[in-house]
Design a protein with these regions (language model features):
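Charged substrate- and nucleic-acid-binding regions of tRNA-handling and nucleotidyl-transfer enzymes
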Residues: 94-154
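Small-residue-rich helix-loop
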Residues: 1-107
């Protein structure tokens, strides 16, 4: 049965729409180190990986806006996040974190208020594996597409 955009073929191997068995396995194996510390129960994994295999709906704007920001500032954050997302492919985790802090500081927002709208745009959820690793596995182009789609809702 399909739970997270991934189902099993007759041989019991994971398959996802548009991906080969090998590609599906590769994405799952890349994601496992990111989610293992966050899992309370194995069944929680399905929800955490859904964004990799299915296109999440754009969340309602109210859910994207951090508590301490308004819609205008959140849209500004999402616009600025495109630079961050585009740079992730060539950055280490530490370099990406430093860049996120630098951009957030330049916008005058806290790091969490910078990252939350990006997380919502890219994964469709407030809870996900670490964002930088998630974007690398998903792919920068796909993350930018989702960010632009979310921006269009503002």
């Amino acid at each position: 049965p399909e739970v997270s955009g991934v189902s099993l073929n007759e041989a019991g191997e994971p398959i996802a729409e548009g991906l080969t068995v090998a590609e599906t396995k590769e994405k799952l194996m890349q994601l496992m180190p990111l989610i293992k510390e966050r899992l309370h129960f194995l069944c929680d994994a399905a929800e955490m990986v859904r964004f990799l295999f299915t296109e999440p709906a754009v969340p309602p704007v109210e859910q994207i806006i951090p508590k301490k920001l308004d819609a205008v500032k959140t849209k500004e954050v999402l616009e600025a996040s495109k630079e961050f997302i585009a740079a992730i492919a060539t950055k280490t985790e530490e370099e990406a974190d430093a860049l996120a802090r630098q951009i957030a500081e330049g916008l005058g927002v806290k790091l969490g208020d910078f990252m939350m709208p990006i997380r919502m745009a890219v994964t469709g959820s407030r809870v996900s594996p670490p964002l930088v690793g998630s974007i690398k596995i998903l792919g920068v182009e796909k993350a930018l597409e989702r960010t632009n789609r979310t921006l269009a809702s503002f």
